[in-house]
């Protein structure tokens, strides 16, 4: 009889950033423009020196410009741009250097606070540098002394951008061309964390000294209801509360409101910076201990230890008149205060699934606005 063994999971596959796609397509288009060479694939050098070959969907000459396109391959990362067509159109210019233009599906910066100036196409610094280095190297090889106008676009990018933080950051009209290493690491969440940092930067640069960091839509709605806070000052942190707290060391605000579901706030109270279930779990013994500190008897503590969920434990305490929600928020507040500068006023809200507040700490209910 054949012995069955557990199948080993295959390693997750890395992909390439939109910045790498833009570099490959602009290089292919420029080469066609200057030498007449049509490419079906092109090799580029990533920022750390690794060489990669990228397949092209098209490479053609049209009137006074050349264009090339490639499909974004994010590997096994759940990237919103996976499978999108990234394209470049390149024209020659008399002045040396490279000038970037936002094509269809690539956004433009409309608010200060980002690394790019207002009015600039949302093509981040590393992709700009990658494209510039490749194009200037090509120009030197071919003896070309002029410059390039490079238009980068993403097919369907305007619709895809609505699934990102771009509209809230003031990047309108499409996606950003991103990447610092040129490689997409599966589930690294680097882009999400970068968007959290950008959100804080944009809010503070535009004069908002009170921000609310929220785990999801329900907590954002709660913050709007409590403070009538504008979207620009709402930071969609998801599970990455650590990204918010640590960034405030560099970019402090006057006031930080943290709002999330009771379970996630209980993880923060236990000292976790990443609230996702992959990295932290509900600690029922700790909940029982906190409940005991605010009046839970031994029988209720045992019930909490055998609860199926944190919400069930909270409901048990509510029925017994034990303010577990507030106690958890107090511990979350203490931990958050230990991370951010002492000058930052912090408050914490825990909510239920309907967005109702089930616990709070550090809250001066003056309804002050930003």
Curated annotation (Swiss-Prot):
Its EC number is 2.1.1.195. It catalyses: Co-precorrin-5B + S-adenosyl-L-methionine = Co-precorrin-6A + S-adenosyl-L-homocysteine. One of its GO terms (biological process) is anaerobic cobalamin biosynthetic process. Gene3D superfamilies: CbiD-like. It comes from the Bacteria. Keywords: Cobalamin biosynthesis, Methyltransferase, S-adenosyl-L-methionine, Transferase. SUPFAM superfamilies: CbiD-like. GO terms for molecular function: cobalt-precorrin-5B C1-methyltransferase activity. Pathway: Cofactor biosynthesis; adenosylcobalamin biosynthesis; cob(II)yrinate a,c-diamide from sirohydrochlorin (anaerobic route): step 6/10. Belongs to the CbiD family. This is Cobalt-precorrin-5B C(1)-methyltransferase. The gene is cbiD.
